[in-house]
Every structure is written in C-alpha cells, then in structure tokens.
A protein has these predicted regions:
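Short helix->loop/beta-hairpin flanking segments within DNA-binding domains
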Residues: 1-30
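Short, hydrophobic-biased segments on the C-terminal half of alpha helices
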Residues: 44-48
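A short, conserved structural fragment
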Residues: 51-61
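The alpha-helix within a helix-turn-helix
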Residues: 33
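Short, cationic-aromatic polyanion-contact patches
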Residues: 28, 61-77
C-alpha cells in the first residue's frame, strides 16, 4: 500500500459519518479522483488495495458510487 492509498483512507475516514458506532461513507469515485487529481482507474486500484488490507469494506456498489464501511485503525489496535 502506497502513500496515495493511505491518503485516500484518511480522506474517507474524515468524510465518513458515524452510524451506530461504525464509520460509513457514500462517495462517487470521481469525487475522490478530483480531490487527489488522479483518474478513476488509479483511485479504483487504491481502493482495491485498501479492501485487500481490510481497511475498508464495500457495503453497496452501484456504477461509480459506493457505500464503504471504514475500519478505524485505532479500533484495531
């Protein structure tokens, strides 16, 4: 996992909403792509890396919008 993936994770955690003690976020990939000035394929690869590491979990995915559950690193320690 590289610095971009970690930055995306921190951004998703900052943008997330606390719902029943869990962090969730609903964002189109294009919003993340514009924030980091990258294309959607690059962002998709980083999101896949975050999923592989267990830092995020896709709850709902429809076209280019996804609802993610964000695992807080502090909760895992």
């Amino acid at each position: 996992m590289d610095d971009l993936a970690w930055s995306i994770y921190e951004y998703l955690l900052d943008e997330s909403t606390d719902f029943q003690g869990e962090h969730i976020v609903l964002l189109p990939i294009i919003v993340i792509a514009r924030k980091f000035d990258r294309n959607h394929r690059t962002i998709s690869r980083r999101l896949s890396a975050l999923r592989d590491e267990g830092l995020i979990k896709t709850i709902i995915k429809k076209d280019y919008v996804a609802l993610y559950h964000i695992n807080d690193q502090e909760d895992n320690d």
